[in-house]
């Protein structure tokens, strides 16, 4: 196991990640790049980002060469934050009467896409569904996953406390679904 010098950076899809930076890994959320390591597999050396997911403390190794394909990306900027809030504020969400297993599959695909906008749509749809009927165990779990992914990334993007961001999200939904 070789550790590469900290000053060595890698360009990925126009984005350079350095040790200490935060990035988003699809389906897992925000993590910190702890190191860039080189490992040898079948005689070929390959560089990896070693990333610790902030919420779960899980460590993920992402091949530097394949990180763009894996969906590794920077935390969103202020314009993208506005777009997330716009998605959450959308009203008149159509309720999909598809069986739960089909909705679950669609929601998981959106969550694993790495797009915070897709995750915001999942959160909005599940909140809307929650107003309409009691969520099943699986739906509640999916709701929590989506909410936590959104809350963590927005709190870092806005440099706000997670509880404050959660309150803002709850306020949006409360206004949208007043009875």
Spans of features found by a protein language model:
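A general, composition-driven signal for non-globular sequence regions
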Residues: 2-5, 22, 141
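A positional/architectural concept
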Residues: 13-70
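Charge/polar-rich, low-complexity and marginally structured segments
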Residues: 65-179
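Short, Lys/Arg-enriched N-terminal segments with co-localized hydrophobic residues
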Residues: 1-15
């Amino acid at each position: 196991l070789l550790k590469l010098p900290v000053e060595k950076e890698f360009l990925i899809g126009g984005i350079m990640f350095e040790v200490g930076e935060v990035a988003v890994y699809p389906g897992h959320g925000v993590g910190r790049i702890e190191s860039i390591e080189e490992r040898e597999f079948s005689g070929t050396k390959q560089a990896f980002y070693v990333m610790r997911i902030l919420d779960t403390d899980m460590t993920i190794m992402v091949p530097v060469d394949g990180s763009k394909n894996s969906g590794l990306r920077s935390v969103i900027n202020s314009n993208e934050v506005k777009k997330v809030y716009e998605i959450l504020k959308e009203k008149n969400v159509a309720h999909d009467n598809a069986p739960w297993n089909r909705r679950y599959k669609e929601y998981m695909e959106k969550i694993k896409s790495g797009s915070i906008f897709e995750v915001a749509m999942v959160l909005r749809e599940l909140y809307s569904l929650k107003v309409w009927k009691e969520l099943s165990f699986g739906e509640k779990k999916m709701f929590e996953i989506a909410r936590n992914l959104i809350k963590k990334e927005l709190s870092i993007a806005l440099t706000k406390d997670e509880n404050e961001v959660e309150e803002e999200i709850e306020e949006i939904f409360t206004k949208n679904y007043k009875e």
